[in-house]
A protein has these predicted regions:
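Membrane-embedded hairpin module used as a gating/binding unit in multi-pass transport
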Residues: 34-35, 209-221, 225-306, 310
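Membrane-embedded helical hairpins/re-entrant loop segments and their flanking transmembrane helices
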Residues: 42-74, 261-331
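Interfacial segments of multi-pass membrane proteins
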Residues: 96-100, 190, 319-334, 340-344
Length: 466
């Protein structure tokens, strides 16, 4: 059945023009965060004279790698999982560490010369995904997922959304009027919209609030800090058409030891994201196409991106929020967004024009998207009847939430002179899994309650019943 309760699983019923519009909506949802990563990374590689890398991470390469990586992920996942892979923020600490390396071969390097070695470390990090995928394939996904009951995955999904909340507020605070316009338009179209408009509230929020930004800009209004609402300077200088400036990565053991361990954190995030998407869509992606396949897709996308000078890729919560809001679960729509990203990478001027989207609008949109992700986590807990009157479940949830929200800057420690950073979500996931394994009194065993598994979108028994 393709449609029930407003859910659409085959977007082809809408026709190609409407599918293209839905693809644009997903592209806009990921765009702001995806292009922010190369901007932040390049800021770490500015030398004492204020000179940055001559060929740092670029927006064009980042967009190409995000789009191509998403298509590769869908191929590995048998075209079944509606996930978009954008730039990962988890490796920012690793980039900063490599930028500050001043021993061995890095002693006489400029900042720009160090950057390819950081990318080389990410290539190895991506290959570690394949190792975990092999382990899961050998031992079976059921045994792995028994360590992730609703008492663990629910709070983790809540943290995925709430950990992004400060970013939404920070962006919105640059111009609260624009942010409220974007948020208000999304709410209006989602609640009162009819037909096609009801399933593209994010796109409508972006378009209408951008029109408002244009009016405010040319009327002489400014942001809260006095800066211009719109800045077209970069778009005026770049060429209309051009190849993304790819550059090959380089390898060094020190840089690998900095970047590769971060994969532990991102793999835990991947499992949380797959659980969130499964719960959102109501399909068991952990079993079919299988967690090992999604890990392979994510790992290969990350390695290939870094191999040619791009950032690591990761499944994007923003697009999960769009799925929940639009109720259109067709992976074809995500693939259209990926194709748009690849096409944009060859048109730097168009990419720059989209980059003029004010931070306040991104913040207003994020209010809805990030909140939706957390709401999915709450629903995960409620629908599975997680008993929070039991001390065991309460302790697990409490520790996960505090770790996920408290370690906002991650946890950095040094091993053998190498600085390693675990993200807040990785800390929360590791803490939750360990507590679930150690504490007595388990009241939920994975695979034994078909209805509970179905509520999570993780019906592990359907394969046995065929």
């Amino acid at each position: 059945m393709n449609e029930s309760n407003g859910v659409l699983r085959d977007a082809r019923k809408l026709g190609i023009p409407k599918m293209l519009i839905l693809g644009l909506q997903h592209m806009f949802a990921m765009f702001g965060a995806t292009i922010l990563v190369p901007i932040l990374v390049n800021s770490y590689f500015v030398d004492a004279c204020g000179e940055g890398p001559s060929r740092g991470l670029t927006v064009s390469v980042t967009l190409f790698c995000a789009g191509f990586g998403t298509l590769l992920f869908h191929l590995c996942a048998k075209f079944k999982v509606p996930a978009f892979l954008g730039s990962s923020f988890a490796f920012l600490g690793g980039f900063a560490t490599v930028a500050n390396l001043d021993t061995g071969i890095f002693a006489d390097m400029t900042m720009g010369e160090k950057l390819p070695y950081a990318c080389g470390g990410i290539v190895v990090a991506g290959l570690l995904y394949l190792v975990l995928a092999l382990i899961i394939k050998l031992v079976g996904v059921k045994k792995v997922m028994r360590f992730l009951p609703p008492a663990v995955t629910g709070p983790i999904i809540i943290c995925i959304g709430l950990s992004l909340a400060p970013s939404a507020v920070s962006n919105a605070s640059t111009n609260w009027l624009l942010a409220l316009i974007a948020l208000g338009v999304i709410v209006i179209f989602n609640i009162w919209g009819k037909g096609m408009f009801k399933i593209i509230p994010i796109l409508m929020g972006v378009v209408i609030s951008y029109i408002a930004a244009l009016i405010m800009h040319f009327a002489g209004m400014t942001n809260a800090d006095g800066s211009a609402i719109l800045n077209f300077s970069q778009a005026a200088t770049d060429a209309v058409v051009g190849l993304p400036p790819f550059q090959l990565c380089k390898f060094d053991l020190t840089a690998i030891l900095v970047m590769a361990p971060i994969a532990i954190a991102t793999m835990m995030e991947h499992i949380g994201d797959m659980s969130a998407i499964s719960a959102t869509v109501g399909s068991n992606f952990i079993e079919d196409p299988g967690l090992h396949r999604t890990l392979i897709g994510d790992g290969l996308a990350t390695s290939l991106s870094a191999l040619f000078g791009g950032p690591a890729n990761t499944t994007y919560g923003e697009n999960t929020g769009v799925l929940e809001l639009s109720k259109v679960y067709d992976p074809r729509v995500i693939r259209l967004a990926a194709v748009f990203a690849v096409i944009l990478s060859f048109f730097p001027k168009i990419a720059d024009l989209i980059s003029t989207l004010p931070s306040a609008i991104i913040g207003g949109v994020s209010f809805m998207l990030y909140g939706m992700i957390s709401a999915i986590g709450v629903r995960n807990v409620v629908e599975n009847h997680v008993d929070l009157t039991k001390s065991r479940n309460l302790i697990i949830a409490a520790v996960i939430l505090v770790c996920g929200l408290g370690f906002s800057g991650g946890l950095t420690f040094t091993i053998g002179g190498t600085s390693i950073t675990l993200t807040a979500l990785a800390i929360a996931a590791i803490a939750g899994v360990l507590l679930n394994a150690i504490l007595p009194g388990k009241d939920y065993e994975f695979g034994k309650d078909p209805q509970a598994d179905k509520n999570r979108g993780l019906d592990m028994n359907f394969m046995d019943n065929k």
